[in-house]
Amino acid sequence: MARSLKKGPFIDDHLMKKITKLNSEGKKTPFKSWSRRSTIYPDMIGHTVMIHNGKAFVPVYVNENMIGHKLGEFAPTRTFKGHGGDKKVAKK
């Protein structure tokens, strides 16, 4: 279910403070964030955010096409090992 338009996008306050501080200083250093639920907004373009996937931090470089999506969409939490192979044993 989509978020109501009257509410607007959700951004954690601590993440907003980090971005505004980096933008005011003119720095583009990567920073860690556990906030997978925050929406990507235009001030984040050009920054590298290290998103936690439950085990490690995944570097995500933010560009224009990501605006409006959640940060967690770009840091997968599950590793796909592949479907089962052919279980038939070949006769020799």
Curated annotation (Swiss-Prot):
Q: Which domain of life is it from?
A: Bacteria
Q: Do the record's keywords include rRNA-binding?
A: yes
Query: InterPro entries from the entry?
Result: Ribosomal_uS19, Ribosomal_uS19_bac-type, Ribosomal_uS19_CS, Ribosomal_uS19_SF
The record's Gene Ontology biological-process terms are: ribosomal small subunit assembly; translation
Intrachain S-S bonds: none
Per UniProt, the keywords (alphabetical) are: Ribonucleoprotein, Ribosomal protein, RNA-binding, rRNA-binding
Gene Ontology cellular-component terms for this entry are:
cytoplasm; small ribosomal subunit
PROSITE patterns per UniProt? RIBOSOMAL_S19
Purpose: Protein S19 forms a complex with S13 that binds strongly to the 16S ribosomal RNA.
**UniProt cross-references to HAMAP family, sorted A to Z:** Ribosomal_uS19
Protein name, per record: Small ribosomal subunit protein uS19
Q: Which organism is it from?
A: Leptospira biflexa serovar Patoc (strain Patoc 1 / ATCC 23582 / Paris)
Q: What is the lineage of its organism?
A: Bacteria, Pseudomonadati, Spirochaetota, Spirochaetia, Leptospirales
